[in-house]
């Protein structure tokens, strides 16, 4: 009986520790739910908190850029998408999507030459 109690305590402690190591993932999922509901300001907040938990999270940064774009905060969305597009650890497809969205933010700001170059970069990575 005592052995079973120790196993139970160990299992609970291990699962609790694992859950605490992934707060960024949980925040990104919550942000995604808010984004789907078109609560863009709330999703921006959640993605920013996720980046606070893990500043290297590509998904949090990329999704933050999309939420900022949908909130019509194009200048901040542009900066965020630039970071996502520059992340050389990601696949060409992911970076191509980031460059495409970067082009969209630049287009909305009437930065047409920069937008064109971002679209070209997207096509170079994923023709």
Predicted regions and their residues:
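Hydrophobic/aromatic packing residues within the alpha-helices of TPR/SEL1-like helical repeat arrays
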Residues: 40, 47, 81-82, 119
């Amino acid at each position: 009986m005592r052995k079973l109690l120790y196993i139970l305590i160990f299992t609970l402690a291990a699962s609790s520790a694992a859950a605490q190591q992934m707060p960024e993932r949980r925040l990104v999922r919550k942000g995604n739910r808010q984004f789907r509901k078109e609560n863009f300001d709330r999703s921006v907040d959640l993605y920013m908190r996720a980046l606070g938990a893990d500043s290297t999270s590509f998904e949090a940064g990329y999704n933050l850029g999309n939420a900022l774009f949908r909130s019509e905060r194009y200048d901040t969305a542009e900066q965020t998408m630039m970071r996502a597009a520059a992340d050389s650890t990601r696949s060409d497809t992911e970076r191509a999507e980031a460059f495409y969205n970067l082009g969209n933010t630049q287009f909305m700001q009437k930065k047409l030459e920069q937008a064109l170059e971002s679209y070209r970069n997207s096509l170079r990575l994923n023709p």
